Regions:
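Short, gly/Ser/Thr-rich active-site loops of penicillin-recognizing serine hydrolases
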Residues: 309-314, 420-433
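Short, charged, low-complexity patches
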Residues: 32, 36, 285, 413-426
Length: 433
């Protein structure tokens, strides 16, 4: 190889010296390019249909849509039609697929994407401006650096912490009437009429908020924080990619150090459903899911093999019975009669999957918007819509893969993110046989 001097524009000036190459160890990356490309396409299209760009009506619509113009300027000609018959760019978000036993990352998708070849030579100013000013920030690796409120995917953490602390058992029940009073505040369940009597399994199956509120207050934020860290949240994963974020798992100490104020019980309630200060990356959510699936300290890696090295993950030191309860709840999400993702399970011939949906509020619908008739997520500006999340492992009886999906401003985790995971795992498992 050569060491070359370049000018400020990246243009070669002269060769400084030649460096003799040295043989190294055999190295194979874990990313499966076939799965990577399929996962990216499935994420970007979601459940929407592509349109042909050649028609005059489409061209007229493009001329009025700044988001689409910025998207096409990146060289991407995929344009979709949403349920309101509007032309929209592909979905933005992230997908992470891991091998549970080895920790190998099979797919690491971030969308929107860009052509990395732009950086191999002289990067033109106009290309840099397009990338840097794009409204959906294609230069951000959402899989490792995107930090999102995990929403209801965090409920497994709370449930596991409560079981381990002896606060609840498999059969402990609380009544969900649709809301819970705490001091002068009222905290609502997503289901206005309430769910009735819930235990931890049915609460995960139906994603009951009030049950989790009650459990979190009795467990305490310190035990919840400890469990979150044991499952891989709140710390960088060590995957070795630049810019990886560690997320936030808040606590009394965190709030005092960062805001100079004391922690309140209401913040425990909000944190328990994965909102408030709680943040996680899609990679961390995949790690959490892998650890729940096999009870070990699974660590992600991008190198499939270096010589004969093989992982040997230590146990999580969590009661297997407690883990089994949480797994049963995740199974019911996909297979229970009232499971929030019951319509999106894997084909039984592939072994099915266990998962958890999450829908994260980005911004409340204002009174003015309601007066204008805006009451549904899809009617709002894209940047104000809820995020859609989903985590799962498969097959159920002998877990091999863990997946996390985040669709930015995608709406429902059930109807948007879960089918993305199903379709990706279907392709992967059919390929593997």
């Amino acid at each position: 190889r050569e060491r070359i001097e370049v000018n400020a524009k990246g243009q070669p000036i002269r060769v400084l010296r030649d460096i003799d190459a040295m043989s190294g160890k055999d190295l194979q990356l874990s990313i499966d390019i076939g799965v990577q490309l399929q996962a990216a396409e499935i994420l970007r299209r979601g459940q929407l249909e592509p349109v042909e760009l050649g028609s005059m009506s489409v061209q007229r619509a493009l001329a009025k849509n700044n988001d689409l113009q910025a998207h096409i300027a990146l060289g991407d000609d995929l344009v979709l039609r949403d349920v309101k018959d509007r032309l929209v760019p592909p979905e933005s978000g992230a997908v992470v697929v891991m091998d549970i036993d080895s920790g190998e990352v099979i797919s690491l998708v971030s969308a929107p994407m860009f052509d990395p070849n732009l950086f191999t030579g002289t990067l033109l100013t106009r290309d840099w401006r397009r990338l840097n000013s794009h409204p959906r920030t294609p230069l951000l690796n959402r899989a490792t650096s995107g930090q999102y409120a995990p929403g209801s995917t965090f409920k497994m953490v709370v449930g596991l912490a409560a079981i381990e602390a002896g606060v609840i058992s498999k059969n402990t029940q609380f009544n969900c009437s649709g809301d819970m009073e705490l001091g002068n505040a009222t905290f609502h369940c997503w289901r206005k009429g309430g769910h009735g009597m819930m235990n931890i399994i049915s609460a995960l199956e139906q994603s009951c908020d009030v049950f989790i509120y009650e459990v979190a207050l009795k467990t305490g934020i310190r035990k919840i924080k400890d469990m979150a860290h044991r499952l891989g949240l709140g710390d960088v994963t060590g995957i070795g990619l630049p810019g990886e974020k560690q997320g936030i798992i808040p606590s009394h100490e965190w709030k005092l150090a960062n805001q100079g104020r004391v922690w309140t019980p209401g913040e425990t309630v909000v944190s328990s459903i994965g909102q408030g200060y709680v943040l996680a990356t899609p990679l961390q959510l995949a790690v959490m899911t892998a650890r729940l699936a096999n009870g070990k300290q699974v660590t992600p890696r991008l190198v499939k093999s270096v010589g004969d090295a093989a992982p040997d993950f230590a146990p999580l030191d969590i009661d297997p019975y407690a883990l089994a309860i949480i797994r049963e709840g995740m199974f019911k999400v996909m297979n229970g009669g009232l499971g929030t993702a019951r319509n999106y399970d894997l084909d039984k011939s592939l072994g099915g999957m266990a998962g958890k949906t999450g829908t994260v509020q980005v911004k409340r619908i204002t009174k003015a918007q309601r007066e204008e008739g805006i009451v549904n997520n899809i009617d709002r500006p894209w940047a104000e819509r809820d995020h859609a999340l989903f985590v799962a492992y498969a097959p159920v009886k002998r877990p091999r893969y863990a997946i996390s999906v985040v669709v930015e401003h995608g709406g429902s985790g059930s109807s948007t993110a879960a089918p993305v995971a199903r379709d990706i795992l279907t392709k992967l498992m059919q390929k593997q046989g």
